[in-house]
Amino acid sequence: MSKLKEISRQSTTSWSPIAQYPDYMAVGTVTGTIGADFDTSSKLEIYSLDITNESKQMTLKGSTSSSTRFNKVVWGQASSNFQNGIIAGAMDNGTINLWDPTKILASDATDGGGSDDQSSLIGVGQRHSGPVQSIDFNVQNPNLLASGGSDSEVFIWDLSDPTQPSALNPGSKSQQSSDITCVAWNKKVAHILGSASYNGYIVIWDLKSKKTLMTINDRNRKCKYRSIVWHPSEATQIVAASEDDDHPVIQAWDLRNTTSPVKSMEGHKKGVWGLSWCPSDNALLLSTGKDNKTFCWNFDRQEILCEINDNNSRNNINNNSNNSNSDNNNGNTDPNAWNFEVQWSPRVPALLSTSSYVGKVNVYSLQDVNEKSTSGSSAGQLNALGIQEQTSQITPTIKHTPNWLLRPCGAAFGFGGKIAVFGRNKKVTAAANGATSPSSSSSPASSVQQSQLQQQQRVIHISHVTTEVDIVKSSEQLENVIHTGQYEQYCQEKIDQSTSDEEKSIWGFLKVKFAKDDRLKILDYLGYDIETIKKELKQFLGTLPELPIESGFNELPIENVDDQSKPEPTTTTTNETVHLEPVVDENNNVVDADSFFDTAASDANKEQQDDSSSSPSTKSPTTTTTPIEFPGDEKEQMITKALLVGDHNSAVECCLRLGRYSDALILAHAAGQELWKKTQEAYFEIVRSPFGRVVSCIVKRDFQLLVKSADLKDWKASLAILCTYAPPTDFKILSGILGDRLDKEASDLKSAILCYICAGDIDKTVDIWSRVSQQHQQQQRQSLTSSGNSITVLEQESNKDLQNLIEKVSIFRSACNGNSNNNTLNQVLSMKYAKYAEILASQGNLSASLRYLAPITNSQCKQEYGVLFDRVYRATSNHQGIPQPPFPFQLVDVYSSNQPIQQQQQQQQNKAQQVGHQHQHQHQHQNQHQHQHQHQHQHQPPQQQQQQQQQQQMGRQNTFNQPPQPMGQHQHQQQQQQQQPPIMMNQSPMQNNNNNRIPMMNQPPMMNQPPMMNQPPMMNQPPQMMNQPPQMMNQPPPQMMNQPPPQMMNNNQPPIMMRPMQPSGPSPMNPPPTMNNTQPPPMMNTMGGPSSVNNSQPPIIPMNGNPLPMNPMSPMMSDKSNQPPMNPMMNPMNPMNPMMNPIQPTAPPPMNPMIPQGGSPMINHPPPPMNPMINNGPVSTPPMNPMMNQVVPQNISPPQMPTRSPVLENKSSSPSSESFTSPAPKPNVHNKTPSIITGQLGVTTPSEGPSNEDTERFVEKLQRSIQELNGRTDSKVWEDANKRCQGLINKVSKKDISAEAFKALDAILASIVEKDFKKASDTYIQITSTPLWGEVGSQSMVGLKRLIDLGLKSH
């Protein structure tokens, strides 16, 4: 918000409504004022904002002088006669002057003075007897001008002829006549006019009836209305401003109820003089008053949005409404220099102007258009030290977004061809719902209700939009054909619609693929129609001489044999071969044309045997007309001699050499099968004519030689021979070979497509169609570029080509559905299907889109369009039996930002633990009500366990009967801990409110003694350290920490134990069974492996000199049968327990300040309140012993241990110990520095994880195994397994599992790869009883189980 320009004039103004001059302003010298130079002249000037000019003054465009001054100036709308409108002035002498702005703009304004030329003055109207106070043009009829004067008269001027304006009275003079201060036309109803009087009355005039419609007056206040404006959109609401200093109020009246105003806005301290309603936003209303304040109001909420002032600074608009309560004058020294007029620009929404009595017209913008920094400083006053202080100006902001900055409407495309359209409807006001009560203006609740009723209602319309109408229509037609199976009819329609021979041939070949006699139809499309050829042969035979035989070939009897009774020769075994007409011998037996030459020799031998076996007398005598003579020619005699002696080979050879091929073939046929074949081969080798080579291929059935050596220009003849003679299996292969030659050698793609269609090769056909489509698109792109058309045309053509391709492929695949090789799609076809499915999905055809996405098996395509597949599947309910695709995104557990990483890992472990080890907690929950104080950390539900773990990780030390504090109080809790006095073992924490004894951490074991119930305080007992100070977190402990106490150096000295005091009263609890050496407590083992302790090992004394308790009150010491196997690390007598081993100090947990900073980390420091040791890593089971999770190697034994110890044996073991060992817990992720203590003692830390090569190999084998099991059994089980295994793949890829877990998983996967699913199942069962289950996660482990089950079912 900023001030743009100013005019050094004491004038009344009017913005230009002309679209050609949106930033022009008419300025007329206002009456009743005088300048510093005592100039009494009057001018009418036109200024331009001209923001390109850096000057702060507006640019003068034209001016003219006037004989009298102005009370009001108004610039009217354009008309047919005056394109730039008319400027009207309410003159002080009682006249209405009219100017032509076109002539004023044409005047010379270079000198800055007014021109005395009165040519721009086009008319003067004189009806008022006193000064004219206000004028206003009718919005809907620019020829009507209303005027009101100090003579209490209102006139309507007709400006049809502005040179002679005529005036009429709208009605009789009102009884409450007074000076007319303002007139205003209704914005919606053209014949309604309002006028305001100085006596506080508002009169509504009706020009149709020429009378007063109503009179409005505030009975409670003596308002003197100075300005009125009609509501821009509500025809019955008018707003009036009172200039009375006692009642500076702005009132909104509704004509339907004039008892009281519907709104009253109070903010000015003195009378309000000017009002202006924003034409672009009905909620913005400007007001200016004698208190030197100009406010911008939110009319709907009746609140001040900002104050507009001229303080010669950058920020001229102040948004602090409280400034209205101040008495300052915003930098103006003269309190009387207030703005008397304010106006919005009708063309530029953000522009407004003010006119003041200080001789300035200021122009402001609600938007900040200055280039200066918003934090710029303006010079301030000198302070007491004489230094000039800089005062920064804060850029104010209006809490209302103007309508011109709001989108009136908008649209957004959604998935599935949806479009969401929003817009703003008309306001629902109180006036539309009925009359307003008189008390509505004074009640705050009703004001809020009014504001809510006036809120704009926004409605969102969701529609379905189809941008590719032709594609959707073609797709629906194709889906209908596939559903009904009317393929031939569909192909015929495509043939009729085709404009090129190529398309007709393709659709014709596709059509014959559905016919029973498809190969005969192919012959027809190749141009070899059988009936036509027969006619041609008949005509050709008529031109040849007749044979010198008694009966011709056409007279041979042929019997019409039914197709079912015909023998099935080789070339007519299926419907795909040509049904040739049968050849019948003299015995009416059908003879196979292909085997005729092969059987001729055997038939001849048979006839000879029959002739020799029969006697001459049995034969019928033959009649010969010509005696038989032996040849006399020398060549024929030699052939005859060879026949006479039975040398058929020589006879045939002689015939071949003499060129008598027919005689050679006849003699070879009579001689036998072997000679017949030799003669046949010799004949084809001698005869090298094209005809002979074709006949050779047919007779020898060497069609592969034909398709590989035939001239490609005769490809149709070659394909016809294949259709006629080739077996069905060879036909497809040979057709593909012929297509390959046409594609690669001749680059004849059109002919190659037809051959591939005959071969049923979808992949190669699609490849050629794709290449043809790309060539077609390149040609179109070049043509469109040269013609200058839009690229949208190219996209539409590309979509049409894709639709044509999908139609052909769909029909082709339907014709070849019997071939199993066509069930999978190659990469090219997969991409085409996916692209087409994406187009269908964008058009809202989700069912068809899903059908094209389902058969895609290409991995690259599935990865690229996996999101689309999942989205389409979820968006439609018509799944058509298609299984749900895998989720394309990775599932990630989201935790709170203030939750520690250890806690997140612990939560994941607890989730898996509840699934994998639920049976281990059943017995504990059964005894919960009996031992809730002794084993509270064991029997709590998972939520409470998690809270305890969080408290331990955050380092809080809660006493037994103290509720846990929230995580947000962690830091405050640490401060309290540093100031708490040490709590001794014999103090109140040993008792609870119920006087039930709670076992302490450092209580000594009591052998064969009654339990210690209520102990008196132990005097002189040193405090016991429960934990190490935080200074030892990443530092080696002091040297004394590595040495045992003095009492541990003597093996013969018994352990030091505290003697319990006798209880003062009876115990409230039954004494638990005591311990003895003959019945040791059971070992606690939850890690899955065997654990035992050497019987000769003595009990181990902790660093404080007291043996750890064996928990004599625990039911686990007495009831062994009801307890699950426990972890030996939890046994207090186990030397592997870190608390029992003084030689193995461990780093304390992080974020656990036990002492104030700067304190000594030695043992003699007073301990904090008791708290179990903090768990540094994730665990697989709830800890029985807080120290069970410390990393301690099992191959290190403490030196100089006592020799006397009860015998401890492990009563449980796990079969998983044979294959897998329990992994050590992961190191603390918060401890960035390696443990120095571990390095000094030679402790080996657990491995970080598998290598990159191992993980990649694992993931590859798992993905391959998943794909191999796809489609063998239940698809739902496979989908579930695939979904679960994706999480395992993510874990392995990120190395979120330990090396031990990876080794176990790799063993299972190796068995799956080797198809040894029984072994994989056994290995899996072993893992379920180990913590590896919880580390890997139940989801991933169940996924492996699903794969194993699928393998067992399929094998």
UniProtKB/Swiss-Prot annotation:
Domain of life here? Eukaryota
GO biological process, alphabetically ordered: COPII-coated vesicle cargo loading; endoplasmic reticulum organization; endoplasmic reticulum to Golgi vesicle-mediated transport; intracellular protein transport
Q: Is DNA-binding found in the keyword set?
A: no
Query: PROSITE patterns attached here?
Result: WD_REPEATS_1, WD_REPEATS_2, WD_REPEATS_REGION
User: Which parts are the WD repeats?
Assistant: 5-48, 65-109, 127-167, 175-215, 220-263, 267-307, 334-374, 412-463
What are the alphabetically sorted keywords of the record? Cytoplasmic vesicle, Endoplasmic reticulum, ER-Golgi transport, Membrane, Protein transport, Repeat, Transport, WD repeat
According to Swiss-Prot or TrEMBL, what is its membrane topology?
Answer: Peripheral membrane protein
- Where does this protein have compositionally biased stretches of type Polar residues? 1230-1252
Q: Which GO terms describe its molecular function?
A: structural molecule activity
Natural source organism: Dictyostelium discoideum
Oligomeric state and interaction partners are given as: The COPII coat is composed of at least 5 proteins: the sec23/24 complex, the sec13/31 complex, and the protein sar1A or sar1B. sec13 and sec31 make a 2:2 tetramer that forms the edge element of the COPII outer coat. The tetramer self-assembles in multiple copies to form the complete polyhedral cage. Interacts (via WD 8) with sec13.
Q: Where is this region: Disordered?
A: 108-127, 311-338, 558-585, 602-632, 898-1035, 1190-1255
- Identify this protein by name: Protein transport protein SEC31
Family annotation (Gene3D superfamilies) = 1.25.40.1030, Functional domain of the splicing factor Prp18 (1.20.940.10), YVTN repeat-like/Quinoprotein amine dehydrogenase (2.130.10.10)
Q: What does this protein do?
A: Component of the coat protein complex II (COPII) which promotes the formation of transport vesicles from the endoplasmic reticulum (ER). The coat has two main functions, the physical deformation of the endoplasmic reticulum membrane into vesicles and the selection of cargo molecules.
Q: Which family does it belong to?
A: Belongs to the WD repeat SEC31 family.
